């Protein structure tokens, strides 16, 4: 019989539970989530249904134990041995009993046999009987992540039925029925880890067995996760077709954009593969792809394919009639709900009290550390997996990019705050694994201890954090003084926390024989410098005002030293660039005038094309940094007096230097780089537009920004609006020129336009182009 213990919710609140399904009365009354209890105790000697035929009235069990609803009327019965040996395993991966079970599983999967449930009717005998639970198809995914338990091994000669199938039955894929039906040994494995979900046991022991869908899996795999059967592409359902379309769109669109500064493709290639088995990743990808798809819809494929004929997976039926915004909201809400539930079971209360579970995967322990939950928890009815820390990081990065698509400031900041906290927490666990007394190859001291997934997520979050701080005129969340964190991400710094030249072999920028492409490291180094520059700009606008020339002198001298230090590091970075960061082709303005028919003003700029997209985008960011650096140079002295002529000459020289960098930013965009470069060029183009005064040049910047949003769906209208308002303030007479260029901002937030301090350069050498 079952020992009724009540649901977990009532047990935690110390309430009496009536165990009503699916929600007990106490939980329904208080509007709480009713979580069934996984604890089941079998006491067959106390059940009246176990009385044998020869049992007398004195020996038989009384009516007190004869529960009417102990077993269902349709329960199936099979003979089991009276003597059962329970074996307690301490190591699931090395225990001989489990290894033997794996062999049996492999044998049964290699030679599947047809199976029909109605054949079990002939197995019922008059001896001792016990009902065997059957696994319903709806609970197969919930039973997958189990890991611990008891093995039953006993010779059973009675289980040798003749298994046959009807002639008309068709088996579409290999099916393995329960092990007890094919082997003389019963191998019952019920696994339960402290970080996995326990399925509902009531339905587990009552629902009929779906033999056509059930397939047992080996339990000795390093990562205990259920692998769903691969469906036939010809019988995809509508939802599966939609998911397939969104997965491919993400790989060619947002995922490819996130991989711009990564050698190879991680988000575009590896993450969709993981999403096949990870519902959390799948819904996150679907939400991001649906949002991007809703903003472009009737466009040709993002990359590859044909514009005249598309694959069936890409062609979604009735695209104009589909409410993609609603689908985006559904996928997003599902992802956030699953993410919060996963985080509640993953993150410990404090770094000192947290537990770190080290699971070796592919020989690299750094790839698979997990923060274990304090107690078993059922995540949800549709969640049958325990996501790893890396998978949670990837999901958070995708959600941040989801908000970055249309620059939803409030939600974007929330995700960035969570991403920063989770990155730091995971990095602390990486640090804790580096024990000083473990001098072995498994615990290296280099930054390679961090996994590729962690690095890919870190640099994506670092770029978004820098851009969010630039847009909102605030400081970044990531601390540039935490050198250990940045070194974990691969940044090469010397003892003085300064960058090293990328082409100086004496500094060991790349280890000998290392196959890593250094362009990725160079691009990431510029992100670190940009973070320092944005923080420098944010601090300069909030300096507390104190009376006294002495205090003002200290503040200005300190900021002046910081500015020169930043300028020196940018110069070191630029002087060490390899040839790959130079334009592979450049077209002078005189050669482009005859080719442009509709927009003759485009011939005012030289076009520069880079063969490596990451280098093109990085150079645009560098030119943007030089503009910001010049415009935020502090005064050398607050008491120094200059004539108006010198001041005017100085401002003109600064504007000329900034316009040189602005034209280079525009020239790279005019060369029509791929969409990944274009979506990352919004902020450089906006910065360049602030330095322009010619109406024709301004029109080009507006056209480039609008084309980015129309072609990719990336939000640029808020920057267009800010540029138009700024140009109207500078030239009130030109309001008619920009009247047709104004566009409404669909966001509720008003984005602050960066304001820069007036700068002064000492001599003309500061104005040279870097």
Curated annotation (Swiss-Prot):
Other remarks on this protein:
Gene clusters encoding host-selective toxins (HSTs) are localized on conditionally dispensable chromosomes (CDCs), also called supernumerary chromosomes, where they are present in multiple copies. The CDCs are not essential for saprophytic growth but controls host-selective pathogenicity.
Annotated CDD domains: fungal_TF_MHR, GAL4
Where along the sequence lies the DNA-binding region? 7-34
Keyword check for DNA-binding: yes
Q: Which PROSITE patterns match?
A: ZN2_CY6_FUNGAL_1, ZN2_CY6_FUNGAL_2
Among the Pfam families in the record, one is Fungal_trans_2
What this chain does, per the record? Transcription factor that regulates the expression of the gene clusters that mediate the biosynthesis of AM-toxins, host-selective toxins (HSTs) causing Alternaria blotch on apple, a worldwide distributed disease. AM-toxins have two target sites for affecting susceptible apple cells; they cause invagination of the plasma membrane and electrolyte loss and chloroplast disorganization.
Question: Which Gene Ontology cellular component terms are annotated?
Answer: nucleus
Report the principal subcellular site.
Answer: nucleus
Where does the record locate the signal sequence feature? Answer: none
Origin organism lineage = Eukaryota, Fungi, Dikarya, Ascomycota, Pezizomycotina
Which keywords belong to this entry?
DNA-binding, Metal-binding, Nucleus, Transcription, Transcription regulation, Virulence, Zinc
Q: Which SUPFAM superfamilies does the record cross-reference, listed alphabetically?
A: Zn2/Cys6 DNA-binding domain
Which protein, by its recorded name, is this? Transcription activator AMTR1
Which residues are listed as membrane-spanning?
A: none
Q: What induces it?
A: Expression is up-regulated more than 10 fold in toxin producing cultures.
Record keywords: Nucleus included? yes
GO terms for biological process, alphabetical: positive regulation of transcription by RNA polymerase II
Localization per record:
Nucleus
Concerning InterPro entries, the annotation shows: Fun_TF, Zn2-C6_fun-type_DNA-bd_sf, Zn2Cys6_DnaBD
Question: Could you list the residue ranges forming a coiled coil in this record?
Answer: none
For this chain, one GO molecular function annotation is: transcription cis-regulatory region binding
């Amino acid at each position: 019989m079952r020992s009724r213990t009540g649901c977990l919710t009532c047990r935690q609140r110390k309430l009496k539970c009536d165990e009503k399904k699916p929600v007990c009365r106490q939980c329904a009354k208080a509007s709480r989530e009713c979580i069934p209890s996984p604890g089941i105790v079998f006491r067959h000697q106390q059940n009246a249904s176990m009385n044998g035929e020869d049992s007398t009235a004195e020996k038989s069990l009384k009516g007190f134990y004869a529960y009417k609803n102990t077993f269902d009327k349709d329960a199936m019965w099979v003979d089991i041995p009276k003597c059962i040996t329970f074996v307690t395993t301490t190591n699931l991966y090395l225990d001989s009993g489990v290894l033997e079970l794996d062999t049996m599983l492999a044998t049964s999967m290699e030679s599947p046999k047809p199976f029909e449930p109605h054949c079990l009717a002939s197995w019922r005998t008059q001896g001792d009987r016990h009902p065997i639970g059957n696994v319903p198809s709806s609970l197969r995914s919930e039973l997958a992540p189990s890991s611990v338990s008891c093995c039953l091994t006993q010779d059973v000669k009675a289980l040798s039925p003749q298994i046959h199938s009807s002639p008309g039955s068709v088996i579409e894929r290999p099916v393995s029925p329960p092990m007890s039906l094919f082997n003389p040994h019963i191998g019952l494995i019920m696994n339960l880890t402290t970080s996995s979900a326990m399925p509902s046991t009531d339905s587990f022991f009552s629902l009929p067995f779906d033999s056509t869908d059930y397939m047992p899996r080996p339990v000795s795999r390093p990562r205990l996760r259920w692998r769903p059967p691969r469906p036939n592409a010809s019988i995809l359902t509508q939802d599966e077709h939609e998911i397939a379309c969104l997965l491919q769109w993400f790989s060619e669109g947002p995922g490819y954009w996130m991989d711009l500064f990564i050698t190879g493709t991680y988000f575009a290639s590896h993450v969709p593969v993981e999403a096949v088995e990870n519902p959390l990743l799948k819904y996150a990808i679907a939400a991001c792809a649906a949002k991007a798809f809703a903003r472009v819809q009737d466009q040709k494929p993002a990359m590859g394919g044909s514009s005249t004929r598309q694959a069936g997976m890409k062609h979604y039926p009735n695209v104009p009639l589909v409410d993609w915004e609603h689908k985006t909201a559904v996928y997003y809400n599902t992802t956030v709900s699953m993410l919060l539930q996963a985080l509640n079971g993953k993150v410990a209360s404090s770094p000192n009290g947290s537990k770190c579970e080290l699971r070796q995967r592919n020989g690299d322990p750094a790839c698979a550390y997990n923060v274990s939950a304090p107690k078993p928890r059922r995540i949800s009815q549709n969640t049958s997996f325990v996501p790893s820390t890396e998978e949670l990081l990837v999901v958070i990065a995708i959600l941040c990019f989801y908000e970055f698509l249309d620059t939803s400031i409030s939600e974007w900041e929330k995700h960035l705050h969570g991403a920063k906290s989770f990155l730091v927490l995971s990095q602390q666990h990486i640090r804790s694994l580096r024990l000083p007394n473990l001098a072995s190859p498994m615990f290296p001291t280099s930054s390679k201890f961090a996994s590729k997934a962690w690095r890919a997520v870190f640099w994506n979050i670092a770029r978004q954090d820098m851009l969010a701080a630039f847009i909102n005129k605030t400081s970044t969340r990531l601390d540039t003084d935490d050198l250990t964190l940045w070194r974990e991400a691969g940044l090469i710094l010397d003892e003085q926390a300064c960058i090293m030249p990328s082409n100086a072999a004496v500094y060991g920028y790349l280890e000998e024989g290392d196959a890593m492409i250094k362009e990725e490291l160079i691009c990431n180094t510029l992100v670190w410098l940009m973070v320092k520059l944005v923080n420098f700009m944010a601090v300069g606008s909030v300096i507390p005002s104190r009376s006294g020339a002495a205090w003002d002198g200290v503040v200005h001298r300190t900021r002046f030293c910081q500015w020169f230090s930043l300028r020196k590091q940018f110069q070191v970075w630029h002087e060490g660039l390899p040839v790959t960061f130079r334009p592979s082709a450049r077209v002078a303005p005189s050669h482009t005038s005859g080719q442009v028919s509709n927009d003759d003003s485009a011939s005012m700029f030289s076009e520069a094309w880079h063969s490596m997209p990451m280098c093109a985008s990085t150079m645009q960011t560098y030119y943007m940094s030089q503009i910001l650096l010049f415009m935020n140079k502090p005064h050398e002295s607050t008491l120094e007096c200059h004539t108006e002529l010198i001041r005017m000459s100085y401002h003109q020289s600064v504007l000329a230097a900034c316009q040189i960098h602005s034209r280079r930013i525009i020239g790279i965009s005019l060369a029509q780089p791929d969409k990944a470069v274009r979506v990352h060029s919004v902020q450089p183009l906006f910065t360049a537009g602030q330095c322009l005064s010619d109406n024709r040049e301004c029109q080009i910047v507006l056209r480039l920004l609008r084309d980015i949003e129309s072609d990719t769906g990336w939000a640029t209208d808020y920057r267009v609006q800010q540029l138009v308002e700024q140009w109207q303030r500078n030239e009130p007479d030109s309001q008619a020129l920009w009247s047709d260029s104004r566009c409404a901002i669909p966001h509720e937030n008003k984005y602050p336009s960066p304001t820069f301090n007036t700068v002064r350069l000492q001599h003309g050498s500061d104005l040279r182009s870097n």
